Curated annotation (Swiss-Prot):
Expression (tissue specificity): Expressed preferentially in adipose, skeletal muscle and CNS.
A Gene Ontology term for the protein's cellular component: extracellular space
One record GO biological process: positive regulation of interleukin-6 production
Organism of derivation: Homo sapiens (Human)
Protein name: Interleukin-17D
Location(s), subcellular: Secreted
Annotated segments matching region Disordered: 65-85
Protein family per UniProt: Belongs to the IL-17 family.
Keyword Nucleotidyltransferase: no
Length: 202
């Protein structure tokens, strides 16, 4: 229904130029792209303004994007007046990188990625690998450029994608937990037995 409504909202020449599935979205020679203002209007209608605000607020500056982020395990700011952003204070900290696709609108989208393999659940913020930092995904709508050309302009259609927006802490699968417990039990048994001790026979 959403696709049909979107195509009905377009000029007749756009709807008639909708591409067939399976064709590569290469821009035909002599076909210009749509004006940025028009793409923003169409995207705003689909996203109802919410995702547009999300897109603009999460865009990173050049310095932040170039920063080499790493897992802040056990790290505490020397200056207590400095309060890191929420994504770095989480037990599953994450950072953002910018995804660029010239055939998509918005062409730039922020994507979250986890900084740690485990979770910072230790007493002093140490990383605990019994838990795992996992990305959290959110569905969103974008405009995708198609191979069709109408009136000398490229035709766009709506497409639904999922993007990572943050990270959360989840327990490791039971198989891994059992393996860790088994390893701990074996080490404990070695400590209890002396070098000349051997398990009693049946």
């Amino acid at each position: 229904m959403l696709v049909a409504g979107f195509l009905l909202a377009l000029p007749p020449s756009w709807a008639a130029g909708a591409p067939r599935a399976g064709r590569r979205p290469a821009r035909p020679r002599g076909c210009a792209d749509r004006p940025e203002e028009l793409l923003e209007q169409l995207y705003g209608r689909l996203a109802a303004g919410v995702l547009s605000a999300f897109h603009h607020t999460l865009q990173l500056g050049p310095r932040e994007q170039a920063r080499n982020a790493s897992c802040p395990a056990g790290g505490r700011p020397a200056d207590r007046r400095f309060r890191p952003p929420t994504n770095l204070r989480s037990v599953s900290p994450w950072a953002y990188r910018i995804s660029y696709d010239p055939a998509r609108y918005p062409r730039y989208l922020p994507e979250a990625y986890c900084l740690c393999r485990g979770c910072l659940t230790g007493l002093f913020g140490e990383e605990d690998v019994r838990f795992r930092s996992a990305p959290v995904y959110m569905p969103t709508v974008v405009l995708r450029r198609t191979p069709a050309c109408a009136g000398g302009r490229s035709v766009y259609t709506e497409a639904y994608v999922t993007i990572p927006v943050g990270c959360t802490c989840v327990p490791e699968p039971e198989k891994d937990a059992d393996s860790i417990n088994s390893s701990i039990d074996k080490q404990g048994a070695k400590l209890l037995l002396g070098p000349n001790d051997a398990p009693a026979g049946p």
